A protein has these predicted regions:
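Histidine-/acidic- and/or cysteine-rich, low-complexity loops and terminal segments associated
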Residues: 1-77, 101, 137-146, 168-184, ...
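Juxtamembrane transmembrane-helix termini in multi-pass membrane transport proteins
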Residues: 2-9, 72-119
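Residues within membrane-spanning alpha-helices of integral membrane proteins
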Residues: 18-25, 151-158, 162, 222, ...
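Small-residue-enriched transmembrane helix starts and helix-helix packing motifs
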Residues: 62-81, 154-158, 186-198
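Generic transmembrane alpha-helix signature in multi-pass membrane proteins
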Residues: 78, 90, 94, 192-198, ...
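A small-residue-rich subset of transmembrane alpha-helices
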Residues: 104-135, 203-252
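Transmembrane alpha-helix/helix-exit interface in multi-pass inner-membrane proteins
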Residues: 123-138, 142-143, 150-177
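A mid-sequence, solvent-exposed acidic-amphipathic segment
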Residues: 168-206
Length: 261
């Protein structure tokens, strides 16, 4: 009886863990879709060079910059939860199991702290992306020659992102992004999650750049990047997935370069 109970508890804990993860994923995905649909109803500003600037980077009538920034970072975080959780959940579960007390409340708290630490790093990245995006768009509005160069610059970014997939940088941080050291210290759980978040950001730098170039509110781009990130983390042969993704992104970059020129 004791053995059956020991087996049943981890199974019940596993179901509960992935059930909660699935609910969080569905909620964040639904909010992301709603946000994208809302943004798509807003007109874009035509720019020299044949592209259009999204209103994501500009305040609407009566809005103040702090509110614009808070809205962007909020949408960014909801989007990142939806995109990263499918590949993060197995890592967090292994961390939960490694605590040696899979059914305990303490293991759950440590796992939650690690997850919050992980996404806090993505929140900081969201702030950086917003500041850089506003600065670049403001410069493009003031300097027409720079606005005309944006399509070529975007194509080069995508091309470099594809090449990055074949680098040792990618292999190194892809391996680091699968590990989270178990600890019974709340502060170390938080910092461990943050460290994992940094590794994931560095690992996904190229794919994140592709997403930003194609539009942060583009559902198709989000879906493709999410599938690529999840596949390269969970597939039995991640190196093959990384190379295939890299080849696709390189072709995309060359096509964009051809169109821009």
């Amino acid at each position: 009886m004791g053995t059956l109970k020991a087996v049943a508890n981890p199974r019940a804990s596993r179901r509960a863990f992935f059930g909660v993860a699935a609910l969080v994923f569905v909620a964040s995905a639904a909010l992301t879709v709603a946000g994208c649909v809302s943004m798509q109803t807003m007109s874009e500003l035509p720019m020299p060079g044949g592209w259009s600037m999204s209103m994501t980077w500009a305040p609407m009538c009566g809005q103040k910059w702090p509110r614009v920034a808070a809205t962007f970072v909020g949408m960014w975080m909801v989007m990142m939860v939806a995109m990263m959780l499918p590949s993060l959940a197995p890592v967090l579960w292994r961390y939960h199991e490694a605590m040696g007390e899979a059914g305990s409340m303490r293991a759950g708290r440590m796992t939650a702290l690690a997850g919050v630490g992980y996404f806090s790093v993505w929140a900081v990245l969201g702030v950086i992306v917003f500041v850089l995006g506003v600065a670049l768009m403001s410069l493009a509005l003031r300097v027409p020659s720079m606005a005309r160069a944006v399509p070529i610059a975007a194509a080069c970014v995508v091309l470099l992102a594809g090449i990055l997939q074949f680098s040792r940088w990618k292999s190194r941080y892809l391996a680091c992004g699968r590990m989270l050291t178990a600890t019974h210290s709340a502060s170390k759980a938080w910092t461990g999650g943050m460290r994992l978040g940094v590794h994931c950001i560095l690992c996904c730098a190229g794919l994140t750049a592709v997403l930003l170039v194609n539009g942060t509110m583009d559902l198709r781009a989000m879906a493709c990047v999410t599938l690529a990130i999840t596949a390269e983390r969970l597939a039995p042969f991640p190196d093959r997935i990384v190379r295939v993704t890299g080849a696709i992104v390189v072709v995309k970059g060359l096509w964009m370069l051809l169109q821009a020129s």
